[in-house]
């Protein structure tokens, strides 16, 4: 086992903060409408130019092990915020840096880190409550477009295309992002359906880049029981193989010998097949299988209606233009079902919604309507070069996550204003002792950081702007894009509540861990110089022995 360095107390925390600052300083230059670009080196090909905070954070790995630990902890803040809310990574990083910087002063002054942490937690809980109170539901297409634009670094075209996509497939609909073929971004709406079940074995994957199985023009077999015996399936497999088309099997379960045989046939290239578990449970599973049958123009093979697997013909199978099966979900695009049958099915489910007694049942039935009627929207991102395409695609994905978050939990005023208003509303939080009070105070000071950074990146004087915004009320804030003050929501500067909330909670969580750190253990650096000097000496000795032998 390699030797370890153990560093304690102030020195450990100081080195960790150095790492935090290096990462946060690189990430925060991208914040706000006048944020700058960061260029990332690639081992081959052109470098990547980005304004996406989490992309910058993911690239950073520091040489000094202790600094690197600090940097990695803040990187965790960015990626966790990105995973949950899809945006707000730069805000989260700026907040984490500010809380750590303020907190370290108190720790150095001899305050109890555990009480500081309790104070921080109290402040964050109060601020999150205030954010939820201030939150406003997103209802109009215009608001959705504004959220998308802000998240895509003030690109209005991206906001508009996402709002159009949501208009077409509904807020619950499925929206995917692909590389386009032209200079302009385009929106395609495809009749389709998504359900939350993925492939039963990773050996079915035929697109390693997307880690998914893609079937073009496949047959779809729907069965409401388990398949464990391959003999039951053989007649169907032979017919499909003769037709030379792929097959998607959706059943309660495919296991044992049946699954093994399907995997072997796929690996040998004899048959392109993917097996997926049927979505839902109990009666809901049967209903969802019927939905898929309606969409693909097939039948559910069920023993209760006198059908069995051995007697299946190609006419009983559904078909679709394309099916994508990922690890956790399956998208059926352009099923061959008749439009009038799908309409009738949707009407039938809508009647059930009206008759439903529980909220849970109603919600599940509404999901089914969205899946049947909604379809899949595909945003094709257009750009002049591949470098621009990658950067733009990342921004579109960010914006899509942000708009979903806005639909889920509503919106608050953007540009760092919501946090300042929450601070004013939560001004009366009390701690149990002086150290907890200090923890509360440091959070209330740190939440000015996002606005300060936005102003700094726009070339303004941060303190002047913060004071002016604090003097205002409601959604009054600073628009850094054109250096004006006014109502942020009217100016279209919005943030999803979920993004602001997640950024604050994750930043405070990791910052608290850093403040309560007392020791760090890292691998000791290897002594390169000593080892290098020994080798030539040894070799020289051997040469001498040869001379003696002569």
From Swiss-Prot:
Function: Together with its co-chaperonin GroES, plays an essential role in assisting protein folding. The GroEL-GroES system forms a nano-cage that allows encapsulation of the non-native substrate proteins and provides a physical environment optimized to promote and accelerate protein folding.
First-listed, main subcellular location of the protein, grouped into a coarse class: cytoplasm
SUPFAM superfamilies attached to this UniProt entry: GroEL apical domain-like, GroEL equatorial domain-like, GroEL-intermediate domain like
Lineage: Bacteria, Pseudomonadati, Pseudomonadota, Betaproteobacteria, Burkholderiales
EC number: 5.6.1.7
Catalytic activity, reaction form: ATP + H2O + a folded polypeptide = ADP + phosphate + an unfolded polypeptide
Cellular component, GO, one term: cytoplasm
Source organism: Polaromonas sp. (strain JS666 / ATCC BAA-500)
Compartment annotation: Cytoplasm
Pfam families from the UniProt entry: Cpn60_TCP1
PROSITE patterns: CHAPERONINS_CPN60
Quaternary context: Forms a cylinder of 14 subunits composed of two heptameric rings stacked back-to-back. Interacts with the co-chaperonin GroES.
Entry keyword set: ATP-binding, Chaperone, Cytoplasm, Isomerase, Nucleotide-binding
Family: Belongs to the chaperonin (HSP60) family.
UniProt-annotated binding residues for ATP: 30-33, 51, 87-91, 415, 479-481, 495
Name this polypeptide is given: Chaperonin GroEL
UniProt-listed CDD domains: GroEL (cd03344)
HAMAP family the UniProt entry points to: CH60
GO BP term, pick one: protein refolding
InterPro entries: Chaperonin_Cpn60_CS (IPR018370), Cpn60/GroEL (IPR001844), Cpn60/GroEL/TCP-1 (IPR002423), GroEL-like_apical_dom_sf (IPR027409), GROEL-like_equatorial_sf (IPR027413), TCP-1-like_intermed_sf (IPR027410)
GO molecular function, one term: ATP binding
């Amino acid at each position: 086992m390699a030797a370890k360095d153990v560093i304690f107390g102030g020195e450990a925390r100081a080195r960790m903060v150095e790492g935090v600052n290096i990462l946060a300083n690189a990430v925060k230059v991208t914040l706000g409408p006048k944020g700058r670009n960061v260029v990332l080196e690639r081992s081959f090909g052109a470098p990547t130019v980005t304004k996406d905070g989490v992309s910058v954070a993911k690239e950073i790995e520091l040489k000094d092990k202790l600094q690197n630990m600090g940097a990695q902890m803040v990187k965790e803040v960015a990626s966790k915020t990105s995973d949950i809310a899809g945006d707000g990574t730069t805000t989260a990083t700026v907040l984490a840096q500010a809380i750590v910087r303020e907190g370290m002063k108190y720790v150095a002054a001899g305050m109890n880190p555990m009480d500081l942490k309790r104070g921080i937690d109290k402040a964050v809980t109060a601020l999150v409550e205030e954010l939820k109170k201030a939150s406003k539901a997103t209802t109009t297409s215009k608001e959705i477009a504004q959220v998308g634009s802000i998240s895509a670094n003030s690109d209005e075209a991206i906001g508009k295309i996402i709002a159009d996509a949501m208009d077409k497939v509904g807020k619950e609909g499925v929206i995917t992002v692909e590389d386009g073929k032209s200079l302009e971004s385009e929106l395609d709406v495809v009749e389709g359906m998504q359900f939350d079940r993925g492939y039963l074995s990773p050996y079915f994957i035929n697109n390693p880049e997307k880690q998914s199985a893609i079937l073009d023009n496949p047959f779809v077999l729907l069965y409401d029981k388990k398949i464990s015996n391959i003999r039951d399936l053989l007649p169907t497999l032979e017919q499909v193989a003769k037709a030379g088309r792929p097959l998607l099997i959706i059943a309660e379960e495919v296991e044992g010998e049946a699954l093994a045989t399907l995997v072997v046939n796929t690996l040998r290239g004899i048959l392109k097949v993917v097996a997926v578990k049927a979505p839902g449970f109990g009666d809901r599973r049967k209903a969802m299988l019927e939905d898929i049958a309606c969409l693909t123009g097939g039948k559910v093979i069920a023993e209760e209606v006198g059908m069995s697997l051995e007697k299946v013909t190609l006419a009983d199978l559904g078909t679709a233009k394309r099916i994508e099966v990922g690890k956790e979900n399956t998208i059926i695009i352009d099923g061959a079902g008749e439009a009038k049958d799908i309409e009738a099915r949707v009407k039938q489910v809508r009647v059930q919604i009206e008759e439903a007694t529980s909220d849970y049942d109603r919600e599940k039935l509404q999901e089914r309507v969205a899946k049947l009627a909604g379809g899949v929207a595909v945003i094709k991102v257009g750009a002049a070069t591949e470098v621009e395409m990658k950067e733009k695609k990342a921004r579109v994905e960010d914006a899509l996550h942000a708009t979903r978050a806005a639909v889920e939990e509503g919106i608050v005023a953007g540009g760092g204003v919501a946090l300042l208003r929450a601070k004013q509303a939560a001004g009366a939080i009390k701690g149990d002792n002086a150290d907890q009070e200090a923890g509360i105070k440091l959070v209330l000071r740190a939440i000015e950081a996002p606005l300060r950074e936005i102003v700094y990146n726009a070339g303004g004087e941060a303190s002047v702007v913060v004071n002016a915004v604090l003097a205002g009320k409601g959604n009054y804030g600073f628009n850094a894009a054109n250096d004006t003050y006014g109502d942020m929501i009217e100016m279209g500067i919005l943030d999803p509540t979920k993004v602001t909330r997640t950024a604050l909670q994750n930043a405070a969580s990791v910052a608290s861990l850093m403040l309560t750190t007392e020791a760090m253990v890292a691998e000791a650096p290897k002594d390169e110089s000593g080892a290098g000097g020994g080798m030539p000496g040894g070799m020289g000795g051997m040469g001498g022995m040869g001379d003696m032998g002569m």
